[in-house]
Amino acid sequence: MGSSAEFRIQIRCSSNMRQRRTNTTLLSIPIELIVDILLRLPVESLIRCRCVCKSLRSLIFDRRFVMTHLNNIVTGINMNTNSFRLLVSHNDSLLLMYCEGSKDGDGSHLAIKEVDHPAVMDTDVCLCILGSCNGLVCLEIGDDNSIIILWNPCTRDTKVLPQPPYHFQDKMFHGFGYDSLTEDYKIMLATEGPSEVMMNVFSLKRNSWRTYEYLADLRTTDQQGCFLNGALHWITFEGVTSARNCLYVYNDPTEDTDFCIWIMKEYGVKESWTRVIKISSEILAQQVFVEVDKLELKVVCILENGEVLMDHEGKVLVSYNPKTRTFRNIIKGKEDDEFQATTYLETLVSPVTAAEGGGGANNM
């Protein structure tokens, strides 16, 4: 993207001493070099750059730039940014978690901060996370008269979607992803009909829902689908998640069965399944303080430092360090508390302009 033409940035400089302003051309740089520099920056820095001048704002808002920046993050080309984030809905709060370097230089630790709710919602309403893809998070807000929104937590862009043609209480499982064939973001909500499963599919391009009847008896162990490699994944036993562009599956532990996490190193190749984590039932019994047979562990994600984040019944969020073989509590709510979590990438993708097509990648 870009041309050989020069990109001139006019910046007005001020002097407090002389109370005067002058216009000065500070830069006269080929646009290819400017674009290359900007593509290496994290989203937070790019948002600040958009305020410098109209020229930079226009460039950073350009759909081709947004797509290239996204693809660089997903494919790992942009190694200078740590764009991986975990969004947690806990009671009335939204928490953002991410890995950052420790001050003593000894690896990294999990940082936690509270983030503002989307502007279209109150702070005391029920919130359900339906999934995330390419930096967009799909949220269901409210109880009886729920609405569904697409939200970029980093840029704060929000789009309220049309009401789906189903009753929220009938929802069986759901997913959110990007269809690269049609360059369209889609939401899939499966609901239980009188004698069949109803597949309700929302197209962001069309801004409308379509309903399909599916006669097979579909049952999954987890409501939220896992989006990877252009497809949504569910599993009919134990659990499934994704991290670092790979599928992970795990089993329910028992007193006689260890808790194991397996990774599919090469997508679609069953021989590539490799066990990466094994937690003995003895360690679980000693450190989690719940009878192993009553544990309902769900792998949320695997962090860059190798720690595994897991939740138990949406009540406790714990971190397991495979090096020290120890657990620590991240969130431990009261008996009536419940939380949800989803991973996402910090990107410039807007739910508003994404409806025009493009701006997608197949993996996250």
Name each model-derived stretch.
Residues M1-M364:
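Short, conserved recognition motifs on repeat-domain binding surfaces
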